Amino acid sequence: MNNMDYDPRSMGSYGPNYNNFNPNFGKIRRHKNTSYPGYNGFDPSDGPMNGPMGGPMGGPMNGPMNGQMGGPMNGSMNGPMNGPMNGPMNGQMGGPMNGPMGGPINGPMNGPRGRQMNGPNNGPMGGPMNGPMNGPNNNQFNGPMNGPNEYYSPEDSDGSDYSDSNPNEFDSDDDDIDLSYFQKRQYDKPTYHKFEVTDEYLADYLLRKFGLDKDKVVRSIQKNKKDEFKAMILNYFYKENPKIKHQSINNQYKLFRKWNKSGLKIKIDDLETYYENKVKPHMH
């Protein structure tokens, strides 16, 4: 085809059947200028960036930045980033963007970061994060995220499980312990018994707990008991002598002194206090 051939720029890096991001793919150029001095089969409008053979960046063999056929990203053979064989950054086959086999992350064979067995990110066997066998973080069954929870089982640092252990059961290793140290200590070994709380112990405990003076507490208790006994004697006196409550306090006390055989001296003030509080309010 003379003036009806395909624009080489529209063929992309992989020939006329592969459209590598070129919107002009398949378009026919109808007005090629063949009178350009030194015409070599391509229009000068191909420009220094897009010339398939002799542009300053797209030379067929020795372009300073391009591979044999393509631009700096799409060279099919020897591009510095996408060469299928000897790219300086890629594995055996592919480029970092379009290489079919060995990109820097997914190369299956010889990529510097995508080795077949021990690649650090995506190697199928020994990646540090996802390798099921020999990854540095995920061993065969002990990965902290994907393992079967060894880090959370109730095991001791030596691997022994003490979740259901009995403190009275001893391992066979205990038979090897040297007991000579214990044999040197001679004393009576006490046996535990349930502690019995006596009243005396309880009283002492409460006195200490609340910071009370024992003597003061004892005197207070004795006084209260004495007052209770006085009230009981006076109550008997008025029950046995119901008519005496209509007499004066002096006459009541004279009779009381003769009546009282309790052995406790009760003053007239005690009798009057009891009369005013317990007897007089109930008189009719």
Curated annotation (Swiss-Prot):
Keyword Mitochondrion in record: no
Q: Which residues cross the membrane?
A: none
The lineage's top-level taxon is Viruses
Q: Name one GO cellular component term.
A: virion component
> Is Transferase found in the keyword set?
no
Q: Where is the composition biased (Low complexity)?
A: 110-123, 130-149
Region called Disordered, residue ranges: 110-176
Subcellular localization: Virion
Please report the name of this protein according to its UniProt entry. Answer: Uncharacterized protein R727
